[in-house]
């Protein structure tokens, strides 16, 4: 009853790709200290995984007491010989069936903290069947099978009913099969990676908890356990090819908690929302104060993400063949668009601005090194694009005055954006609190998304993309130009390639009619993910390797790989 047929062998390697299942917060990986041992961890918002180990030093021993090697891992379980190690959506760990005389040894972290796990009084963490405690010292437990088909269950969070291992494996196999059957069709050379990416989107699906009962596809169970607004847009764009309902749900959830002024929160999580500096834990507040502008000292700083909302909604509606989602969400999106112009406007930059690096999605970018308040060409391009989509929706809905408002505002914003164009450098400059920002980053290329810019500007941006001293890296497109003094190959947003910025540039090239160039960048982006070994958070622009601090199984990288691979297949057929 294994899941070997659902995913190509070797993809769940238990190192970069841990074993987990849909709706569970539990992950199982090899112990960093000893590869023959396993660890069970629980993903929680704003808590490092290394601080979330619930079961450590887990191993299966045969009747001689020798360790049974950890074998294959698939979407259903990890296999140690005939013994399965599986987790469930109820955050339980199941191990079995064990032959007579075999045993399981492990260390329960926080063994006296049942109350912290939400267990009712008297409900123990361990449930066993045909097993006897052989040894228990310093938290290490060894359970021996008295007869054939022995098994055990470990509760890791809250109450959970006793379930036999065969029932768990059967249910997990059925759910994994249903999910993988939805994996979109792609070209044969992309299929192996597409299946991994689709599996990642499935297992990253969680019920957030707290006041949020909806299913969210989190960016990663390894460090990003919540619904990030920006991530939700990109994830929905990929999900639309196989699960329209889940795609819609991501956008509806992301837009479900606007402020009274229309601002959309940065993050939704089990403990609440992150919408301003007031919502941050003290450690993050210290970082925020260090990064923020003196202009906003001692103020409540709003935190959000770039306005790509209408684009994501429009693409999901196109996949559905209707306009239902746009009609449902038009007013919320229009209010958030107005918030940028009315509440996130800065006279220092004469336009809407990121009032803090966190709101850009690119908080480590060098454009914020000397200015926290930035009127950025990417933000202005997104606002222009969003107003144009809102104009189209308003005309379709018979809202003529609103359509004209969106049209007029987009034209005014385009005029302001064009003032920052520097033809000799082939890019748009960001504007900070002290004037033009000179750092040469991918943000200066995002106005490719604006239909109607002069052909000379389009060609200037393309020349920058194809300049080997700037953005034509071995693996394109670096987030900072190669010749820029602030370029760093492996540091987040200061050089590495991100799938989402490449995806945006591909859309921009298509908008400008540069179809062959868009296809070439699409192909190289897909090749990068395959060469890099999976949908990582970001990639080296030198060799596509995963930088040391980049997380794995990253949601938008997986989703946008799917989107690009589906488009590639459609072009081929």
Where are the regions that the model predicts?
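Extended glycan-interaction surfaces of carbohydrate-active proteins
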Residues: 187-226, 254-255, 260-296, 345-375, ...
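Terminal accessory carbohydrate-recognition/targeting modules of carbohydrate-active enzymes
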Residues: 1-189, 222, 227-230, 241-242, ...
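Aromatic-rich carbohydrate-recognition surfaces in CAZymes
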Residues: 225-352, 380, 496-512, 518, ...
């Amino acid at each position: 009853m294994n899941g070997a047929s659902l995913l190509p062998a070797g993809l769940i390697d238990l190192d970069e790709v841990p074993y987990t299942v849909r709706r569970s917060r539990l992950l199982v990986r090899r112990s960093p200290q000893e590869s023959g041992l396993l660890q069970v961890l629980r993903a929680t918002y704003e808590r490092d995984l290394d601080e979330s180990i619930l079961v450590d030093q887990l191993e299966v021993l045969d009747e001689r007491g020798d360790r049974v090697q950890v074998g294959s891992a698939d979407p259903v379980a990890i296999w140690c010989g005939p013994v399965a190690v599986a987790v469930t959506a109820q955050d339980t760990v199941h191990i079995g069936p064990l032959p007579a005389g075999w045993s399981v040894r492990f260390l329960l972290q926080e063994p006296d903290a049942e109350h912290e796990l939400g267990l009712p009084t008297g409900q123990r963490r361990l449930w066993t069947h045909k097993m006897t405690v052989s040894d228990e010292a310093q938290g290490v437990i060894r359970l021996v099978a008295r007869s054939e088909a022995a098994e055990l269950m470990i509760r890791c969070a809250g109450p959970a009913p006793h379930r036999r291992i065969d029932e768990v494996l059967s249910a997990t196999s059925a759910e994994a099969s249903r999910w993988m059957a939805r994996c979109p069709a792609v070209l044969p050379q992309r299929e192996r990676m597409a299946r991994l990416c689709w599996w990642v989107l499935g297992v990253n699906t969680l019920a957030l908890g707290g006041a949020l009962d909806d299913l969210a596809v989190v960016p990663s169970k390894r460090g990003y356990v919540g619904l990030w607004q920006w991530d939700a847009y990109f994830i929905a764009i990929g999900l639309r090819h196989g699960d329209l309902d889940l795609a819609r749900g991501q956008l509806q959830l992301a837009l479900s908690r606007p402020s009274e002024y229309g601002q959309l929160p940065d993050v939704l999580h089990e403990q609440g929302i992150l919408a301003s500096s007031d919502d941050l834990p003290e450690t993050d507040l210290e970082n925020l104060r260090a990064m923020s502008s003196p202009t906003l000292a001692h103020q409540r700083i709003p935190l959000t993400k770039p306005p790509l909302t209408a684009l994501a909604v429009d693409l999901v509606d196109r996949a559905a063949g209707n306009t239902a989602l746009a009609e449902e969400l038009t007013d919320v999106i229009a209010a958030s668009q107005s918030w940028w112009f009315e509440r996130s406007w800065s006279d220092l930059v004469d336009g809407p601005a990121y009032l803090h690096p966190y709101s850009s999605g690119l908080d480590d970018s060098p454009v914020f090194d000397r200015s926290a308040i930035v009127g950025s060409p990417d933000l202005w391009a997104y606002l222009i694009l969003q107003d144009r989509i809102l104009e189209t929706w308003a005309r379709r809905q018979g809202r003529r005055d609103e359509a004209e408002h969106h049209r007029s505002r987009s034209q005014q914003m385009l005029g302001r954006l064009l003032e920052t164009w520097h033809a000799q450098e082939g890019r748009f400059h960001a504007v900070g609190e002290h004037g033009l920002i000179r750092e040469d980053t991918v943000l200066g290329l995002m106005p490719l998304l604006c239909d109607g810019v002069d052909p000379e500007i389009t060609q200037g941006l393309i020349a920058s993309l194809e300049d080997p001293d700037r953005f034509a890296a071995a693996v394109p497109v670096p987030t900072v130009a190669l010749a820029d003094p602030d370029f760093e190959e492996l540091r987040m947003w200061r050089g590495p390639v991100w799938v989402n910025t490449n995806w945006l540039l591909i859309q921009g090239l298509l908008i400008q009619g540069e179809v062959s160039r868009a296809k070439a960048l699409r192909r190289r982006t897909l090749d990068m993910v395959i060469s890099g070994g999976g949908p990582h958070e970001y990639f080296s622009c030198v060799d596509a390797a995963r930088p040391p601090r980049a997380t794995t199984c990253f949601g938008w990288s997986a989703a946008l790989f799917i989107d690009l691979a589906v488009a590639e297949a459609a072009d081929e057929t």
